[in-house]
Amino acid sequence: VTLGRIVDLAIKDMNNMGAAMAPAAADTLRRHLMDTGRTAADYDLIISGDLGKIGHDLLLTLMMDAGVPLDAVRYVDCGMLIFSPEQDVHAGGSGCGCSASVLCGYIMRLFREKAIHRVAFMATGALLSPTFSQQGGAIPGIAHLIVLEADEA
């Protein structure tokens, strides 16, 4: 488990939660990899939920800037897994609903089928106060990470 820290990059657009949460996800993932001595390649999947397309791309950029490149095949986002690019959902899904659905439905099935053995799963969140945001306040983000592992046999 890697506990997240509140990260505030002064994102004020309450319609862009991915941009508000991606910096916290990048911070948590970077610290997790440093603390464990692992690399992104040590995981079958690295999953965020729910940054959506905008936050997903921003996380890739932030990690590259930090010298920890991720590939877009190994790193996936729950909102992007639930919705296809053809659907008009704009940035993503519903946050905790996306994370829970993907983890319990899709990821656990991959573990049962022995298709994956180690996953870094990051739940992301925005510390959003609609009133504060409407008054021009920033939206800090946070992300916590757990590693799920199964025997390879």
Label every PLM stretch briefly.
Residues 1-30, 35-36, 72-80, 118-123, ...:
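Condensing-enzyme catalytic core mediating Claisen C-C bond formation in acyl metabolism
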Residues 3-7, 47-53, 125-126:
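Glycine-rich beta-alpha junction loops
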Residues 6-8, 16-20, 24-42, 54-63, ...:
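Conserved active-site "lid/cap" helical segment
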Residues 42-49, 120:
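Short glycine-rich phosphate-binding loop at a beta-alpha junction
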Residues 51-66, 131-138:
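Short glycine/threonine-rich loop-to-helix capping motif typified by GTGT followed
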Residues 65-102:
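Conserved catalytic cysteine-centered active-site region
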Residues 105-108, 152:
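Soluble secreted/lumenal catalytic domains
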Residues 119, 128-130:
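Short, solvent-exposed loop/turn segments at secondary-structure junctions
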